[in-house]
Amino acid sequence: GYASYWAPNIFGHDALTTLAIVGREVPRIELGTSVVPTYPRHPMAIAQQALTVSAASEGRLTLGIGLSHKVVIESMMGMSYDKPIRHIRDYLSILGPLSQGQPVQYAGEDYTTYGAINAKGAQPFDTVVAALGPQMLKITAEMAAGTITFIAKLSEVPFPGLSEVPQPVFDP
């Protein structure tokens, strides 16, 4: 059998909802999203949904998030893709504590959030971030459990200083 199942969130079924179903029906395998776009969902809302999946799957979730693509966010969804680095830093500042079952008090430039989520049976989950550029990789190293690359193995991504990343990097 499979050791893990990673669900994309690309114009079809919602990845987190899919994983909640898979997690209830298929025991033992690890589950992950690759990736859920951040712009359309408030970090507190995605934390609540991911904690629900964690409860349904007995803690087998790794949440993969990413910025998506400018054309998708601006042209298809009509949202601003301005300042993506600031956006992901604010996003992770809120999602980080909530993913570990902790309350959050954060006032950033893109988001301000004060609160907690009490999802009965949920276990903390790791967050990995789709990142290829040096700024995104730096933020990911500081604030997430790892990274997910797109159409490239991490060993094929030539970024100076990558060997200095202090945390493990996830490369599915």
What are these regions (language model features)?
Residues 2-172:
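Active-site-adjacent structural elements that line small-molecule/cofactor binding pockets in enzymes
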